[in-house]
Structure formats: structure tokens, C-alpha cells
């Protein structure tokens, strides 16, 4: 069997206008010229041609897909760049908005300041206009005064009577008013003489008024200086200083006495309060017991002290019986001194509660020995209790 020769023929695809019809090769021409011997060879050739076409189409598709992927990657890169640019633009816009807000705040503050300044300028302008009007009025008044040549001098003088020469100002007004009226009626030749006389009169009187004013001022200053000197002399004189010293000494003595009295009063009040507190804390019975126990301790610590006879009764309860046992200690009989009656006044009423029971003991002229012994025994018991507690 002969090997069949393969001939690749590229057919133009539909839709490509530049594709030209393939030129038949020499071998293809020979095969076309040859008579078709067998149908199998033609089928094989057509299958091979179709496979080649499919491969070429697949290659083209792969190339197109690669191109599409490249363009897609480029588009993704451009999109990422665009996103970065958009983010940067957004950041710049936010910064711009913040700057705009700050500028708006500053502008509003500036506008408020400008409004305040404008209000102040208006007020200043109004005050300046008022001052200008006042200045104009003053200028007009000054011009009128200069034209009239009338000057009223108001002087304050204390304790000085005004001289009679100052009353000439009224006569000056009348004298100036009369020549003006008469000058209109009289001729032109007489006017200058009267004006000159009036001027001379007014100038002389002004000089006299100034001299009187200067003299009165000098006298007033002199008088005030003399008064001040006299006041200083009186204040710092020896008699005044001695009087002040005596007064200060008297005041110091009074204050010392008052302080002493106050201290005595406070001491008495404090003593009373302390006595009250003592009576509240330690009653009179307890105080007497402590006193007797203290005396007993002192006796016990002194050698060769006198032992007095003493009896003590003890009670023992054994139901249904009670036994009273009396213990008698031998010794000398204690001689007690008779105590006088003590009168309690109104001043001692506050301390009466403290010394109530002590007074009762003092009132007895011949107290019972057994009662005294019982008191001493109770004080011993109190001391024992105190030592146990310590």
C-alpha cells in the first residue's frame, strides 16, 4: 500500500475580506488531474484538512484570549490607578472642606469684629460731631464776648466780703448800652470820643478788679497756712501730749482691771462647772469611801499604827436558815471628835449635792462606832475591788 501524501490547503474563513483563494500547488494540480481512483483517499484528505483548520482556529482563539487577558490586566491596572487618584481627590476634597469651614469661621469672626468696629466708629463719629458742634458754639460765644467786651469773673472766697468795686460790671453794661443808643442819634464826630472814654474806664476797672482778686487770693493762702500751723502746734504741744499720755495710761489701767475681772469670772465659772462634772462623775458616797480607803492605806503603810476594835457581821444563807455571824477584833476604842453643825447658805446650794452625805456624818455629835466600822469595811471592799480591776 502506498503512503498517501498530505497536502495542507488553507481555506479562507468567512468574514475576512483580505483572504484570497489559495493557489493550487503543483502536486494538488497533478492530483486533480489524476483520475480519482478510490473514495477512501479523498475522505482521508478531507479529514486531515479539517483537522488542520481546527488547529489553526484554536491557535488563533488562544492568541485572541491571550490578547484579551493582557488588555484586561492593563485595564485592571488603570482601574487601580484611577481608584488611587479618586481616593487622593477625596482626601484633598475633605481637607478643602475643613479649610473652607475654618475660613468661614474666621470670616464670620472678622465680620463680627467689623460690625463692632463700625458701631464704635459710628459712636466716635457721633461724639466727634457733638464735640464739633460744641466747639462751634464756643467759638460763637467767644466771638460774641469779644465783640461785646464783657467778661464775667466768678470768684469763690471764703470769709472775705466782696468789695464794692466788683459791682461796676452792671454799670459797665448800662454804660455800653447807652452810648450805643446815643451814638446812633448823634453825629459821627462824637462817637469815637465816647468809645475811647468807655474803653479807658473799662480797662482801669479791670486792673483794679485783678488787683483785688490777687490780694484776696494771697490773704486766703496766708490765712490757710497760718491755720494749718496753729493746728499742728496744738496737736503736737506738750500739754496735749501729756494729756494723751495720761489718757492712754488710764485706758490701759481700765483694760487691765477689766481683763482681771473677766479672768476671775471665767475661773469661778470653770470651777463651778468642774465641780458639777465631778459630782456627776463621782458621787458623794463614792468620794467618802475613797477618802476612808485612802486613809486606811496610809495607816497600813505606817509602822506601829494604832489598831482599833472592830466588829463585822456576816450573813450566811443556808436555806431555809440564815446565820448572822459577828466577828469582833480586839484593840483600843476609837475616840471620835464631836463635829459642829454647818449652815449651808444660798451660795453653797450648788455644791450641796457633793457634800450632802458628808454633812450628815458631821452633824452627828456621837456617831455609832459600829456604823463607822462598817464604813471602813466597805472602803476595804472597794479597795479590793479596785485592785482586782487593775
Curated annotation (Swiss-Prot):
One of its GO terms (cellular component) is membrane raft. Pfam families: PTRF_SDPR. The modification Phosphotyrosine is found at residues 156, 308. Residues 136-152, 233-249 are annotated as: Nuclear localization signal. The modification Phosphoserine is found at residues 36, 40, 46, 118, 167, 169, 171, 175, 202-203, 300, 365-366, 379, 387, 389. Residues 257-297 are annotated as: Leucine-zipper 3. Transmembrane segments: none annotated. Residues 166-186 are annotated as: Leucine-zipper 2. Plays an important role in caveolae formation and organization. Essential for the formation of caveolae in all tissues. Core component of the CAVIN complex which is essential for recruitment of the complex to the caveolae in presence of calveolin-1 (CAV1). Essential for normal oligomerization of CAV1. Promotes ribosomal transcriptional activity in response to metabolic challenges in the adipocytes and plays an important role in the formation of the ribosomal transcriptional loop. This is Caveolae-associated protein 1. It comes from Homo sapiens (Human). The lineage of its organism: Eukaryota, Metazoa, Chordata, Craniata, Vertebrata. The gene is CAVIN1.
Amino acid at each position: 500500500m502506498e503512503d498517501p501524501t498530505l497536502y495542507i490547503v488553507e481555506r479562507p474563513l468567512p468574514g475576512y475580506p483580505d483572504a484570497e483563494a489559495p493557489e493550487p500547488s503543483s502536486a494538488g494540480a497533478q492530483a486533480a488531474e489524476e483520475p480519482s481512483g478510490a473514495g477512501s483517499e479523498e475522505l482521508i484528505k478531507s479529514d486531515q484538512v479539517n483537522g488542520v483548520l481546527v488547529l489553526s482556529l484554536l491557535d488563533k482563539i488562544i492568541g485572541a484570549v491571550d490578547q484579551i487577558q493582557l488588555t484586561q490586566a492593563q485595564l485592571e491596572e488603570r482601574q487601580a490607578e484611577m481608584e488611587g487618584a479618586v481616593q487622593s481627590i477625596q482626601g484633598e476634597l475633605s481637607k478643602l472642606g475643613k479649610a473652607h469651614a475654618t475660613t468661614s469661621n474666621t470670616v464670620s469672626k472678622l465680620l463680627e469684629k467689623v460690625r463692632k468696629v463700625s458701631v464704635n466708629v459710628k459712636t466716635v463719629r457721633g461724639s466727634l460731631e457733638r464735640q464739633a458742634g460744641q466747639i462751634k458754639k464756643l467759638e460763637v460765644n467767644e466771638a460774641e464776648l469779644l465783640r461785646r467786651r464783657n467778661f464775667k469773673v466768678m470768684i469763690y472766697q471764703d470769709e472775705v466780703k466782696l468789695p464794692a468795686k466788683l459791682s461796676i460790671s452792671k454799670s459797665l453794661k448800662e454804660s455800653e448800652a447807652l452810648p450805643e443808643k446815643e451814638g446812633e442819634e448823634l453825629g459821627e464826630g462824637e462817637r469815637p470820643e465816647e468809645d475811647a472814654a468807655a474803653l479807658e474806664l473799662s480797662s482801669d476797672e479791670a486792673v483794679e478788679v485783678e488787683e483785688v482778686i490777687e490780694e484776696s487770693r494771697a490773704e486766703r493762702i496766708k490765712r490757710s497756712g497760718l491755720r494749718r500751723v496753729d493746728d499742728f502746734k496744738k496737736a503736737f504741744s506738750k500739754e496735749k501730749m501729756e494729756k494723751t499720755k495720761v489718757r492712754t495710761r488710764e485706758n490701759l489701767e481700765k483694760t487691765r482691771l477689766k481683763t482681771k475681772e473677766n479672768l476671775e469670772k471665767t475661773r469661778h465659772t470653770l470651777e463651778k462647772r468642774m465641780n458639777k462634772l465631778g459630782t456627776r462623775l463621782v458621787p458623794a458616797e463614792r468620794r467618802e469611801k475613797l477618802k476612808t480607803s485612802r486613809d486606811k492605806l496610809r495607816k497600813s503603810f505606817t509602822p506601829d499604827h494604832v489598831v482599833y476594835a472592830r466588829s463585822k457581821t456576816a450573813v450566811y444563807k443556808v436555806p431555809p436558815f440564815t446565820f448572822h455571824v459577828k466577828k469582833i477584833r480586839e484593840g483600843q476604842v476609837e475616840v471620835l471628835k464631836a463635829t459642829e453643825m454647818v449652815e449651808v447658805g444660798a451660795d453653797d446650794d450648788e455644791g450641796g449635792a457633793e457634800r450632802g452625805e458628808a454633812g450628815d456624818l458631821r452633824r452627828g455629835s456621837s456617831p455609832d462606832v459600829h456604823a463607822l466600822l462598817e464604813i471602813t469595811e466597805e472602803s476595804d471592799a472597794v479597795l479590793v475591788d479596785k485592785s482586782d480591776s487593775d
